[in-house]
Amino acid sequence: MNFTLFSGTSEQPRLPQDPSAEPFELKAVAGPDIWRTPSSAGGRDDFSGPIYATPLSLDSFKRAQVTISANFQAPYSQGGLILFMPESDPTVDADGQSLRLHESLSTWIKAGIELVDDQLFASIAAGKPYSDWSLTRLGENTATFEMEKKNGSLWIYVVGSDGNRTPLRKLTWVFDMKPQRDVWVGVAACMPKGDGTANGGSFAVQFRDFGITTE
């Protein structure tokens, strides 16, 4: 599988060609997010957070998992798995090192850890076309998240420090989609609010034990 960085920052550390073989880190700066709402709920349309992902056919997807850890300080700082469906082919960014999409995507799912009201949650958001969002109290800054195709639906699980695998969400519509292009599966990091410093600071998310299974 060939992995590609989307919307990378100048502070981004080296990323491994095979992210399943070694731990790695994504760096986010203040501002970019992955979130979409109608005008009645604020009118945001944003798909600009850094992502490290690989393309594959939706029919072939079976499972993705990763262990996430970070020093969550800024409101809504987040990191986790992502699956998204581009409507057009991405192009090389001006830095020549990453890809960029021409439009804010209408179909995506992200699952990871997020800081909300000074507490850590397992956070699931899905856009189709607007974002919905669910939170489950986690209380720790390290956890493993899994996306799995099961009986035609996408299930999302979290595994905490106690080793228990807890189902968080069942999305029944994902594999009913008929995308004209490959979907992309990988990891993302965002810090939409900044950390209160003059330039908003930066936020690093560590990922390990990353893997994708196809069928």
PLM regions and their residue ranges:
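Extracellular glycan-recognition regions
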Residues: 1-215
